[in-house]
Amino acid sequence: MKDKSIKVLEFNKIQEILKNYTCTKAGKDIIEDLKPYDSVYEVREHLEETKEAFKLLITKGAPPFEGVYDIRNGIYLAEKGSALLPGQLLKIAAVLRCARRFREYINHKEQEESYRVLENICEGIFSLPKIEEEIFNAIEGEDEIADRASSTLYNIRRSLKEKNYSVRDKINSLVRSYSSYLQENIYTVRRDRYVLPVKAEHKGAVPGLVHDQSSTGATLFIEPMSLVNLNNEIKELMLKEKAEIERILTVLSAKINANITGVKTDANIVWELDFIFAKAKFASEYNCTCPTINDEGIVDIIEGRHPLIDRREVVPISVKLGEEFTSLMITGPNTGGKTVTLKTVGLIHLMAMSGLMIPARENSVISYFNNVFADIGDEQSIEQSLSTFSSHMKNIVEIMDKADENSLVLFDELGAGTDPTEGAALAISILENLRKRGAKIIATTHYSELKAYALRKEGVENASVEFDVETLRPTYRLLIGIPGKSNAFEISKRLGLPDYIIDFARENISNENIRFEELIQNLQEKSIKAQEDARLAENLKLERDKEKKKYEEKLEGLQKVRDNALIDARREAKNIIKEAKEEADKILKDIRQLERMGYSSDARRKLEEERKKLKDKLDSIEEKEIKTVHKGEALKNVKEGDEVLLASINQKVIVLSKPDNKGDVLVQAGIMKITANIKDLRAAKGSNFNSNSSKTKKSKKLNLNLRKVESSVDLRGMDAEEAIYTVDKYLDEAYLGGLGEVTIVHGKGTGVLRKTIMDMLKGHPHVKRYRLGEYGEGGTGVTVVEIK
């Protein structure tokens, strides 16, 4: 990308604005080096990171940048093995804390939107909470080490405090004793030693060491001899304190050095995030959107705004290029906004290719170009010198040397500054050459010859900036498909030029030119009307979309309320089922106890009565849940091989048998074969619950049909293979039926069948534990199994 074009399009001013949104000098340095990226992939990734940061600002508020510093100097010193100052260590700890908090800020919960690019960046954070904690624990301020930094420091400072109390008590006593010899009845400190301000003429009255004198010489600061030892002890303690502080700082600095890779990585990530969120804050402030990026030369800027023009005054422009036409000729009067249009298109492209969201409407399309060339200068003056033409031509020669099919070329007043006939011919030749190379071109011009060139040349389109003749002011709106009109006669008339002069001027223009100008005016009026109608239609569409979105959000909210209600209902049903299961287990244990005591007949009757009560209760829960959750009608007929939805466990199953006279069918759910009733089956195709099946599969679902699962299975008379198949099927049904404990009757016999069954139970997924029956349960002829 040419630096000259970047400068001409004023991208550096965007960089300066961006810097205002950063928190660190390092972030500003990243922005200082910001330029368009080298590939469409990089552009898309950096735009995505900006969009993600923009969404985070909206959904989670400001990122945790509190206390973020530029710690590059501290890192450099630590890497060299130097001991850092307390303030430098504090700043490093603050950056480490910011990195850790940022990881928490970025990480999303399951129901939240994920942020792929930012999460990948934050994956690189080392997170060093131990070092962070040690520094904050040891250092309280820029020059203040906490007492808790070490037990040695704590003891030294406690001793210092005690010694200072002793010295102050003694020196206060001396102040009272020597008050007549002192300038003031106070004590002071010189060079960390307690002294008295003695009048010079009484220096012999206070025996001690002179440490200082006043500027006039009238006062001597004398350390009384009785305080020398105490002051010495205080000085020694202060030296020990200093040495301990240096040791603490050295140890902490060494820990930074030992983890320098992690510290540097975390700091660099924080600074990168500072830069990314600066882009997001800019986008929020300037009402920017994320464009679609292509590498096919297609441009569709919808209501783009120049970000450097006052937002209250800027007029949005819409520009298309690259599909129906690859060159756009913009004509119209001076000060009409032609140059601003060029700069807007160029600057928006530079912003997008640098990973910045653009000041334009949603669904804008930007093409990735290897180069954006801009020949834009101050061409608004009346007189244009040869030197100006030469300067532009030198720039154009350079563009002609480098432009190709992956280039966007912007020309302002191409061919101006020389003879109009020669200038127009030269401009057409330049444009045609670039067009044949495949370059995308937008050019402004005054020349009528270029209007005609655009009209007759395929792939080239005219455009103009709208001018309001009534107010004599441009509206700055871009009209694509309509060549510009000079409006010289209309402007002159409104400014007061006599009609006879204007009429005489018209006579000197050919009828063909007059008809052409009238045609342009007619087209402009129709285009303006069409654009007003289009804007009205667009506003109506936006209003409709807004209302649609509002109702969709309201519907989504109602659906969430419904889903939450269903979850609560299912939770309540599970609790009831759990209580019922526990009650059934208790009854089974009571019955076995009664059987041991010889009350088998009554016990069995009681069991059946209680099981019937449970069945009725659970069936009512099942029916209620199915009616609540599943709106689809139950299937009336199924055949072997059909894939259907088993509503009670919300899972697709395969039908293995035809319904019996009770409506029960055998189905396969994964590796398990279970019995279900046809009333519990729904059509799998188009089911509203298919999308949720992956979520519900993970949680254990209970088959509520207790009436189908007996509390025991009898294997007597079966061979080993048949018994294993029967027990495996039975345990599946017992597990889904929610039974806590079951009995397998295998008989005593030779013990072969018992051993076969026990070997099988050892690794069975549904078995928690098992044992041989006790007296009254069937002894060694049965195995009692506890289900998970």
UniProtKB/Swiss-Prot annotation:
UniProt superkingdom: Bacteria
SMART domains in UniProt: MUTSac (SM00534), MUTSd (SM00533), SMR (SM00463)
UniProt KW rRNA-binding keyword: yes
Disulphide-bonded residues: none
InterPro entries: DNA_mismatch_repair_MutS_C (IPR000432), DNA_mismatch_repair_MutS_core (IPR007696), DNA_mismatch_repair_MutS_sf (IPR036187), MSSS (IPR046893), MutS (IPR045076), MutS2 (IPR005747), P-loop_NTPase (IPR027417), Smr_dom (IPR002625)
EC code(s) of this entry: 3.1.-.-, 3.6.4.-
Signal peptide region: none
GO molecular function: ATP binding; ATP hydrolysis activity; ATP-dependent DNA damage sensor activity; endonuclease activity; mismatched DNA binding; ribosomal large subunit binding; rRNA binding
Reported function: Endonuclease that is involved in the suppression of homologous recombination and thus may have a key role in the control of bacterial genetic diversity. Acts as a ribosome collision sensor, splitting the ribosome into its 2 subunits. Detects stalled/collided 70S ribosomes which it binds and splits by an ATP-hydrolysis driven conformational change. Acts upstream of the ribosome quality control system (RQC), a ribosome-associated complex that mediates the extraction of incompletely synthesized nascent chains from stalled ribosomes and their subsequent degradation. Probably generates substrates for RQC.
Family: Belongs to the DNA mismatch repair MutS family. MutS2 subfamily.
Assembly and interaction partners: Homodimer. Binds to stalled ribosomes, contacting rRNA.
Protein name listed in UniProt: Endonuclease MutS2
Gene source species: Clostridium botulinum (strain 657 / Type Ba4)
Gene that produces this protein: mutS2
